Amino acid sequence: MIWTRLPLYGPSKPSTGGWQPLRFDGGAFHVKGTAELARALLVLRLCAWPPLVTHGLAFQAWSQRLLGSRLSGALLRASIYGQFVAGETAEEVRNCVGQLQALGLQPLLAVPTEEEPDSTAKTSEVWYEENLSAMLRCVDLSRALVDAHGPARNSLMQLKVTALASTRLCKELSAWIQRPRGSSELSPERLAEAMDSGRNLQLSCLSTEQNQHLQASLSRLHRVAQHARAKCVRLLVDAEYTFINPALSLLVAALAVRWNSPEEGGPWVWNTYQAYLKDTHQRLEQDAEAAHKAGLAFGVKLVRGAYLDKERSMTQLQGKEDCTQPDYEATSRSYSRCLELMLRCVSNHGPPCHLMVASHNEESVRQATKRMWELGIPLDGPVCFGQLLGMCDHVSLALGQAGYMVYKSIPYGCLEEVIPYLIRRAQENRSVLQGARREQALLSQELWRRLLGRTA
């Protein structure tokens, strides 16, 4: 077993009525305006239409040719962009976050920049340096938003590694890590030392040019983490495709060695675990134990996963064994096991162990809230919840109004940059978008109630 100490959080003493499950029946929609609800219903129905998701970029180009850039842009701003994006300027982001804060929700900013996973073109260092500047600005904005609206410990932001290091490099590193002797040359401690000292690494598995890019990438990651720590902003590193995940995990582990000391208020760097992968529970257990033995704090964002369709098609093309769970039910069981593992970790170790329950699934959220009550984990403790901006508001609002810490993942930026990013996210989250029928039904029900003038 991983945890041998007595729990820091004792079992809750049942209240008079016992544990009361949250109601995700749309009752929380009363705090939203009618125009907001109508837009949400329209956009979610559009996003559940497979041809629009599959050919999103083509539809965008067609609308620009037919309507012109200005009118096409205005329609997008009034619909998809307005639903899922905070805005372009810092002031627009502040206004969006202020509205969320008034509803009991917190911001989790995301810079919508990444390298295409199947890109073969070489990207210049200038692009990665520009992304570094964007990430540093995101840290500043995340802190400024918290200064205005809440305690500093609640400041989080997302970090995409492939915005700072090339996919090609991550593929090379992942392939080397998976070799029998490859991991000995690529230890987290060695990378952490290189980040801190700035001394060049010369890895035998990489060419001279790749070693130079690795050093530059380590420097960029270190600068973001250093700036985030100085501003008291926690970094949640996004998971990506399985063929580069070993490299991402190594880089996150290196950052953790440097920045996740409990004495410094860690974890400042969290990793993301995807429950749709067969080995996730085992890896999560191993990583939790490794962090505990090393005396490090441990931060986890737990998701079901967004790359299922592409992962399976890539596996078939390569003739490899499928690493994903066979169906949605198996993924849900995996998520439930990982959730239980992490909640017990939080119960036993307290603040050095942090968890974000990043799920749109009502049953997973109910399980988390019930187990938090049973384990005595306080609502303002190390467990929080996460959903996408513009989706799953009936769950987010119910959680926020009940006093839980809830974050909305918030992309921001100009229309030209964000729309392709949103289309890629929609293609990756097809099952989530098509499965949002209940949310659509609740939105429709609330709109009809208002139209007919009925009381809630």
UniProtKB/Swiss-Prot annotation:
EC number: 1.5.5.3, 1.5.5.2
Record-level Gene Ontology MF annotations: oxidoreductase activity, acting on the CH-NH group of donors; proline dehydrogenase activity
Keywords, sorted A to Z: Acetylation, FAD, Flavoprotein, Oxidoreductase, Proline metabolism
Modification N6-acetyllysine, positions: 310, 320
Gene Ontology CC terms, in alphabetical order: mitochondrial inner membrane; mitochondrion
Keyword match Transit peptide: no
InterPro entries in UniProt: FAD-linked_oxidoreductase-like (IPR029041), Proline_DH_dom (IPR002872), Proline_oxidase (IPR015659)
Induction: In liver, by TCF1 and HNF4A.
Catalytically driven reaction(s): trans-4-hydroxy-L-proline + a quinone = (3R,5S)-1-pyrroline-3-hydroxy-5-carboxylate + a quinol + H(+); L-proline + a quinone = (S)-1-pyrroline-5-carboxylate + a quinol + H(+)
Similarity-based family: Belongs to the proline oxidase family.
Function (record text): Dehydrogenase that converts trans-4-L-hydroxyproline to delta-1-pyrroline-3-hydroxy-5-carboxylate (Hyp) using ubiquinone-10 as the terminal electron acceptor. Can also use proline as a substrate but with a very much lower efficiency. Does not react with other diastereomers of Hyp: trans-4-D-hydroxyproline and cis-4-L-hydroxyproline. Ubiquininone analogs such as menadione, duroquinone and ubiquinone-1 react more efficiently than oxygen as the terminal electron acceptor during catalysis.
Name this polypeptide is given: Hydroxyproline dehydrogenase
